[in-house]
Amino acid sequence: MAFQGTSRTLTQQSSAATSDDLQKILFSPEAIKKMATECDLGRHHWMRADNAISVRPLVPEVTHGRIASFFKSGYDVGELCSKGYMSVPQVLCAVTRTVSTDAEGSLRIYLADLGDKELSPIDGQCVSLHNHDLPALVSFQPTYDCPMETVGNRKRCFAVVIERHGYIGYTGTTASVCSNWQARFSSKNNNYTHIAAGKTLVLPFNRLAEQTKPSAVARLLKSQLNNIESSQYLLTNVKINQNARSESEELNVESPPAAIGSSSASRSEAFRPQVVNGL
């Protein structure tokens, strides 16, 4: 399809002509499987001593090649205005520790461009998390769109880099990182405002919180009291022990003695405290 009409029309025609084909490339069963196995999209990545540095591209190599070929073929025949760009609005990483807080170690997480041989953080977007800071949520926002090209033998795209430091004596998994993002592809690139990487420390989930509420405690005590013989908590019609003090005596408030035969004396004689079985 050749370009015709205004710029707005061209954009609409390009999107309509390419959306179905891109959908097939991005959401085929093979592409979905590659996103999970090669990129760890939505999966927990374990940081171990034998995997101290992890570089996870945001697009699988096979999928990258197919998308790049698609845009290149459209560009070569004049149907697309570029060879394609990759944009990622945000990368969100949930980081949790899997060792005790007294373990001395840290994680360094940042977003990189595979076109950079040094794998430097993009615009300084780098976050360091000590073990006792975890759990935490880390957010990255790229400041440019990545061209779909090959640099040397590397497929250029964004990647999440995780470095493990310290943790002497801990050879197993010390932290788990679960990353989520949504990659977008277009023949036009975007302009962005520079935003620093964000870090939000998260309070650990209290599994016993439900048992520490007053209602839960009351129910627990009531169930325990009900398991004991009720005779220990129900008063019979026997005369009350004279050692029991009234509330006025506990407050050291002296009341004048009531005359025998008075209405107040009869009310006092008729009063009997009651104890409810349980709470």
UniProtKB/Swiss-Prot annotation:
Main localization category: host cell
Keyword Cytoplasm: no
InterPro entries on file: MPV
Sorted UniProt keywords: Host cell junction, Transport, Viral movement protein
Entry's localization field: Host cell junction, Host plasmodesma
Pfam family, any one: 3A
Region of interest called Disordered, as start-end residue ranges on this chain: 247-279
Compositionally biased region (Low complexity): 254-268
Lineage: superkingdom: Viruses
A single cellular component GO annotation: host cell plasmodesma
Biological process per Gene Ontology, one example term: transport of virus in host, cell to cell
Family affiliation: Belongs to the cucumovirus movement protein family.
Record's function text: Transports viral genome to neighboring plant cells directly through plasmosdesmata, without any budding. The movement protein allows efficient cell to cell propagation, by bypassing the host cell wall barrier. Acts by forming a tubular structure at the host plasmodesmata, enlarging it enough to allow free passage of virion capsids.
Name assigned to this protein: Movement protein
The species this protein was found in: Cucumber mosaic virus (strain Pepo)
Organism lineage string: Viruses, Riboviria, Orthornavirae, Kitrinoviricota, Alsuviricetes
